[in-house]
Amino acid sequence: MMLQRSCIVLFFSLFLLVPQMVFSMLNRTLLLIPHPDPELVAYQVQWKVNASITRRQALDTTDQAGSTPCITGNPIDDCWKCDPNWPNNRQGLADCGIGFGQYALGGKGGQFYFVTDSSDDDAVNPKPGTLRYGVIQEEPLWIVFPSNMMIKLKQELIFNSYKTLDGRGANVHIVGGGCITLQYVSNIIIHNIHIHHCYQSGNTNVRSSPTHYGFRTKSDGDGISIFGSKDIWIDHCSLSRCKDGLIDAVMGSTGITISNNFFSHHNEVMLLGHSDHYEPDSGMQVTIAFNHFGEKLIQRMPRCRRGYIHVVNNDFTQWEMYAIGGSGNPTINSQGNRYTAPTNPFAKEVTKRVETPDGDWKGWNWRSEGDILVNGAFFVASGEGAEMRYEKAYSVEPKSASFITQITFHSGVLGVGGRNNNLGMWTTTGSEGTSGLDSYNDYTDEMSGAGSTNRLSFSVLVFLLSSISYLVVFTSSTQMFML
């Protein structure tokens, strides 16, 4: 009996040695399950777009008073903007998502948290009322801004799960160190926020929850970094001039929708996928819809590795190198976009297979369906039998490309301040003003902001779990022996 008790005590002691974050990380990683039928999700997006356009056309025909109808043809905006009572039903926004990120709940069902303090003086002990204090809480929160504010971050803003950043009704800018980090979390909605002039930070402690803070290595300086996360929706934001990417999603992240955003003044706009050889990124599924890729963009709109990427009804107004690139055999489904090529005769191609021989990418699944190609733009499709596989008899066709101006007219931040970031307020030299134009390197194995306290090597994890299993078996055997 004494031996049995000793084993039980040892079992629980070893169990307590395993940090809570390891189990949290393990559980979240196991839940990064892709949708079983991505083509169905793509079909549903196009169906919703065409349904909104049909309603808009019907209103144009029947409207006798000459007033402008609310319906725009954009199914996300039509879902909430047509409700005159939306300020009193803010959480209804969570029901308006489309695509792979449509299940992002954000803080729906939770309390409202009001950001009343724009300061960010302490990344370990943030003050109540600050944005940092709100995003680290455990419970669902719908975070709103009662006034205009400029939030200058000192370090990465690390989110906890089930949070909505709702900037409607205010002019909210997030700039500085970091900026936004979504690491091993789920159910995040970021809506109507200016995000720009983000630079590298780190090599210090940062709090990620009310009960945990840890040392963070140097971040890459992304506008929004999505790392091992799911059910993420980024809508109606204006992003520009960050050190690395404007939005980067890596390490098996999936269930993401990036919609109605305005991108400008940046080099490497969007990276989807950690590396060509990182298997979990094969399950990455991202919808990129109704965005305006505006002036002074160079490349990566997006740059994909593995996964399934649905690019639908976006307006690409020139690029300097290419618009959509990839490696590692991603599936790219381009539907109903408008691609306007630059004047450079050597940069007319929409697509780029990055550092991949022709013989390797010929079988990759890249298609263009219903896209509008302007100023000599051309899309190089690939995939054996792609036309037969992709042009099946859908009842929905991407006819909405001709409505691109209408669908993307309100891209970026709505209301106060407009969609353009007020670039005149910022210098273009030094760490806070780095535009990102000097960053051409791809991601390396040293991922941004991944602090050592948040990681436990796989071998150590296996050892601990194996030890626990061994003790359970040993205890049972001892009990049987004593009987």
Swiss-Prot record:
One GO BP annotation here?
pectin catabolic process
**Enzyme Commission (EC) number:** 4.2.2.2
The pathway noted for it is: Glycan metabolism; pectin degradation; 2-dehydro-3-deoxy-D-gluconate from pectin: step 2/5
- Catalytic reaction annotation: Eliminative cleavage of (1->4)-alpha-D-galacturonan to give oligosaccharides with 4-deoxy-alpha-D-galact-4-enuronosyl groups at their non-reducing ends
Alphabetized GO MF terms: metal ion binding; pectate lyase activity
Highest rank taxon of the organism: Eukaryota
Residues bound to Ca(2+): D220, D244, D248
Presence of the UniProt keyword Ribosomal protein in the record = no
Glycosylated residues, per the record, are: N27, N50
* Signal sequence annotation: 1-24
Q: Which residues form the active site?
A: R300
What's the cofactor?
Answer: Ca(2+)
Q: Which family does it belong to?
A: Belongs to the polysaccharide lyase 1 family.
Concerning PANTHER family, the annotation shows: PECTATE LYASE 12-RELATED, PECTATE LYASE 18-RELATED
Name of the protein in question: Probable pectate lyase 12
- What species does this protein belong to? Arabidopsis thaliana (Mouse-ear cress)
